[in-house]
Amino acid sequence: MYSILNPLFSHAPSFIKTTRRPKPPLLSSISLHSRSSGEEAKPILLLLPPIWTATEIAQAVNGRIVQCGPPGTISTDTRTLVPNQWFFAISGETFDAHDFITPKLSEKGCIGVIGNRVSENWNKGFVSTDGDSLVSLMRMGSYARSRFSGEVVGVTGSTGKTTTKSMIALALGGCEKKVYENFGNWNNEIGVALSLIGIPGNAGLVVLEMGMDSKGEILELARMARPSVRVILNVGNSHLVNFGSLEEIAMAKGEILVEAKPGDVCVLNADDPLVMSLPLPCGVKKVLFGRNTGCDVRLVVAESTDGGRAVQVVLEKNGKRVKFRIPSPGLHLALNACAAAAVATHLGVPLTQVGHSLSTFCPVHMRSELQVAKNGITIVNDAYNANPTSTKAAINLLNDIECRGKRVAILGDMLELGSNEIKFHEMILEHCCNAHIDLIGLVGTRLLTAAKNLNLVEHKNVVVAHDAKTLALEILKWIDPDDVVLVKGSRGMEMETVVNALKETEIQSGN
């Protein structure tokens, strides 16, 4: 049994400049959950998120109270705002949320506004902020962090952040303190700030993931969250469009370490030379995870089992081993579990308890998520995002799954890879051809160019399209009920369109 708190009190605004965030449930409360292997999470206790007074809000954003309002929780989305919430108006690249401050907002139960301005007929609470609204939100996040005295775990890396963050929270369920993790992959400035603002008063441990598109972003997130445990999972070729090399990406990820204080813990992947090359501040404690014999927590065994639908893992710490089964496909999950064990055991959870907790792990939505449609198709829904490393791992996952029908890889473009993007797409297609893949579906200009370069466009086992909707219609002509279908692509390719079509369409045998 474990306890995890999620910030279900608001949505990230729709104009976040990075990737789209999944929508949290329409709740103004936080649930603790108990889960056993193979079961859905069951709520056992309902807790309210932290309540903010107008005075606290004004102090947090360095603003002033123009009109006092009652205490309440915080929202950034007028569409999902519920009664007794303050609305934090953020100006984005596409929308200015101040434009939505109307009497209708009051009718929904909004008790106050935090922002630069309100309409003339606004008669509820108003805390005025000066300057950039995003800076004010981050200032409030930093203030919220200063009110929390427990441990904060910050996780970054090129791949596996969300999955590992969830595994860490799950593994920490073996300790006595209540664990709070950021919702989904709220890993940019807005998401991390909202997660900090939502820390419940009775939480003892916080787990946050931190993402970036460019240099300096991780440093800002780390300054706001001030993690006492700082985790770097890996360095890969995502976001190469904004960097000149993998070494530059490594330095950007390494910003999470820069301002670590003496006594802070840095949890590092010993198998990644770029991670290990990063300088550490004086006085920090280094905890290593990986396959190398010198690791504090070592991955001894990672084997595909249950016909490729689960992973058998053996971890070792101080000569003691634990063996457990992760009920989800993908050998890459073993190293994620190793990282989670490194964090949890350092914070006092016994290794055996970590193994027991991780044996109940359920994959994050649209990340190696195994789904069986009513029409008989087995879908590996890995549609949330993609880079060369994660796409290769997904193809390997598909290759490992036992299948009575065809193995089908439906791939969308991998974005933000810079000047060598076509070469990366060619490498992925070559990997598909060398694996036991029976049918390949491709969508996007980059994959189409790569397929042309490799003379694959006219191949009978390759289906191409310029958008996901068209590809879904075409690929369904070739799919049979017993097929296993991987769907993978960058967020901007909207590959969930294909997933939904696979789920909803009746399939006739003999395609």
Model-flagged regions — what are they?
Residues 472-478:
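Short amphipathic alpha-helix with an adjacent loop that forms part of the alpha/beta core around
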Residues 126-132, 461-471:
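Short acidic-hydrophobic, aromatic-tinged amphipathic segments that line or gate anion-handling sites
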Residues 57, 85, 104, 140, ...:
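Residue-level signal for inorganic ion chemistry
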Residues 37-48, 155, 365-369, 391, ...:
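ATP-dependent carboxylate/acyl-activation modules
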Residues 1-139, 401-403, 417, 430-431, ...:
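N-terminal leader/targeting and accessory segments in enzymes
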Residues 115, 120-123, 229-378, 430-433, ...:
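Acidic, Mg2+-coordinating active-site environments of NTP-dependent enzymes
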Residues 92-95, 364-366, 383-464, 508-511:
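Active-site beta-alpha connecting loops in nucleotide-dependent enzymes
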Residues 134-270, 274-282, 500-510:
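Phosphate-binding loop of NTP-binding sites
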